[in-house]
Regions:
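Ser/Thr- (and often Asn-) enriched beta-sheet segments in non-cytosolic proteins
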Residues: 4, 12-18, 24-26, 90-93, ...
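Extended low-polarity, hydrophobic cluster-rich segments
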Residues: 21, 29-30, 46, 78-84, ...
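Beta-strand-rich recognition/accessory modules
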Residues: 197, 201-211, 217-220, 227-300
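Extended, loop-rich substrate-binding clefts of extracytoplasmic carbohydrate-active enzymes
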Residues: 58-190
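Acidic surface patches and DE-rich sequence motifs
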Residues: 10, 171, 220
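A short beta-turn/strand-edge loop motif at beta-sheet boundaries
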Residues: 189-197
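Generic structural motif
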Residues: 20-22, 30, 65-72, 97-103, ...
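Beta-strand-rich N-terminal accessory domains
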Residues: 1-110, 237, 243-244
Length: 300
């Protein structure tokens, strides 16, 4: 929901910020997000809009926290929002409530409950992430198993909730977003919710994604230029800055290396199930406050 704070403009649904010409940013509660992909159940961050077209596809947007507990991943399923205008900047305060886990479901049998199956699945996903030579085989294996057993990806309540506050300061004239992440805790409906625990959580990832069919080209300050599958699904960026490019809409978004974090790039496009491209900052759980700048650029 969008929460009213003293002196701030509020909205009951989406918050939309115009950038340049037909390009804008949008964030809103999960029920206002398109439902084309399994990740529609997840709470998204700032997504790019061009002439009314959502460019995020399956991507979760800019500045979205994800938590790792070993090989298990926790996703945001709810949000509280507030915003205000400061000169040429608009400030959005988002509190993400981390309360969803990925599950497999069968239309006839419902949610798969086998702990051993999820143990295997999560370890294979971790192998896919960490060992690039195995990715093609693991993707083919996943697709085969899903087809054979009629499995689909869903996201269900995890049974616990952690809160992560993310402030976005958007300079619409410059096309710059300053993102401040605070994992020390927040409140939900007036009740305190714990932040990210130092023990138990093994990694905090701040995702910055849009759609893979739009942003299909990677470029960085070292001169590397990659397209499509050559980008990889989760590879570390070593250059000082890096961008994803959408030639159709003449757009790019760019991030830089930040002390205390590792920057990863990725792109996946698998049928109608997966379509994301972008970056993730990987942080240890002890780093509970983190700030970075994301630039959105209009290309010639």
């Amino acid at each position: 929901m969008v929460q009213k704070l003293a002196g701030e403009k509020t909205s009951d649904k989406d918050i939309t910020i115009p950038l340049f010409s037909e390009i804008s940013l949008k964030i809103g509660p999960v029920f206002a997000i398109r439902e084309d992909y399994p990740t529609s159940r997840l709470q998204k961050g700032l997504i790019l809009i061009s002439n009314g077209q959502d460019l995020a596809e399956e991507g979760v947007g800019f500045g979205v926290p994800v938590l790792k507990m070993g090989v298990k991943t926790i996703f945001p399923g709810e949000i509280e929002l507030a915003y205000l205008v400061e000169g040429s900047c608009q400030v959005i305060e988002a509190i993400y409530f981390m309360n969803l886990e990925e599950r497999l479901t069968n239309q006839s049998l419902g949610s798969v409950q086998s702990r051993s199956l999820y143990w295997i699945k999560n370890h294979l996903a971790d192998l896919h992430r960490r060992f690039p030579p195995a990715r093609s085989f693991l993707t083919a294996l996943s697709n085969k198993l899903r087809s054979s057993f009629g499995w689909q990806t869903t996201f269900e309540e995890a049974g616990y909730t952690y809160s992560v506050k993310v402030n976005y300061t958007v300079d619409s004239q410059a096309g710059v977003i300053v993102v401040k992440v605070d994992a020390t805790g927040a409140t939900m409906n007036g009740a305190p919710k714990g932040g990210v625990p130092i023990h138990g959580i093994t990694e905090v990832i701040v995702m910055n994604e849009q759609g893979a069919q739009h942003f299909d080209t990677y470029s960085d300050s070292s001169g590397t230029l990659l397209r499509g599958e050559a980008i990889g699904s989760w590879d570390q960026v070593t250059a000082g800055s890096a961008s994803f490019i959408c030639s159709t809409h003449r757009l790019a978004f760019r991030l830089q290396q930040i002390d205390g974090a590792r920057l990863f790039r990725g792109m996946e496009l698998i049928g109608s199930r997966v379509a994301w491209s972008g970056f993730g900052y990987s942080l240890p759980p002890t780093n509970q406050r983190f700030t970075y700048r994301l630039s959105i650029e209009r290309l010639a």
